[in-house]
């Protein structure tokens, strides 16, 4: 489909070779499926060594992140940047994103390896409480929002681990309240995630005006707020405006994969309409602008398929373990592709590896439940 879009977009700014090699990701997803099948049927002895290794690495990140949060720098000497905790990732600022993307895999492994949840209840509560807190203190707003959407859906559909996650979320809320009241730590994630986001969405209208609900000026200020409402921020609105222009130029096939970036390069990042960047910072907007209506049909159909299968899975007469595994990875894949939050570049190598890895695990779990 991407090849079709690239070559059909006659005036596309996208080098065709950027789409020629995208086929490696579907191959990667199928490879994950075959590897899981092979290990299950041939040599895989279900022990929890892999989970122990992952838990150890994650716990190290917890410790390092808290050291950076409390003292201002981590054990490697990396300091807090832009009010965000990054731990060993340094200037990359992807700690929250990394942890969020690992969360579905960890939960999937817990069910796949048949870990005794009741026996390890207290350990799991401590682990997931710290997990959610570290995503919060990382200051990554998108990861924090997606984590909450993911957890809401898991709590709704996966009964087995519902209580543990709810207790962990309660402890997260208590931590947020305590950190705001006591003001400890060298960064202020509450301000970044909640206050700054609100000010960006309202374009600082409330920040710049004192609202008195008892006078006539209040009505004018409220009207001004409505006029200045932004989708996430002024920059995001600028990206979406430019993406809308590219979509209108070629609505069927779009500007081609990575077309937003190459258009911005062609105008030296000084577009007459909107604001240039490397990508539109939203999956839905990017797919519409770069792959057009054709790409949108595939994207929307994929999300709809995931929702339908999540709902139908609950009625399948299969092992509870297999159903829980399928629900976890389905929700993880759906939330990773969620269209209503800021996002990275859909065609980015790291994100593509993550999404197609999820797809490979999804295909494996799908076979267990629906075949």
Regions flagged by a language model, labelled:
Residues 63, 67, 158-227, 241-249, ...:
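A membrane-periplasm/extracellular boundary helix in multi-pass inner-membrane enzymes
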Residues 219-291:
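Long extracytoplasmic/lumenal interhelical loops at the membrane interface
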Residues 27-34, 46-80, 89-161, 166-181, ...:
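Alpha-helical transmembrane segments of multi-pass inner-membrane proteins
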Residues 1-27, 39-47, 64-93, 136, ...:
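Interfacial transmembrane-helix termini
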Residues 155-157, 161-165, 290-335:
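Hydrophobic transmembrane alpha-helices and their immediate junctions
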Residues 123, 127, 278, 282, ...:
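Loop-to-helix entry and N-terminal half of a specific, functionally important transmembrane alpha helix
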Residues 5-8, 41, 68-79, 113-116, ...:
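Perimembrane helix-loop junctions in membrane proteins
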